[in-house]
Amino acid sequence: XXVPYPRPFPRPPIGPRPLPFPGGGRPFQS
């Protein structure tokens, strides 16, 4: 898991490939 941040930050700019997570609030960490 990742660990969800206390506040939802703006989703990162969309690159050539889809985001590793929906919404953009939780960073992809294990």
Curated annotation (Swiss-Prot):
To bovine bactenecin 7. Keywords: Antibiotic, Antimicrobial. One of its GO terms (biological process) is defense response to bacterium. Strong antimicrobial activity against P.immobilis and M.luteus, less active against E.coli D22. Residues 1-21 have a biased composition (Pro residues). It comes from Carcinus maenas. On the 2D-gel the determined MW is: 6.5 kDa. This is Antibacterial 6.5 kDa protein. It comes from the Eukaryota. Residues 1-30 are annotated as: Disordered.
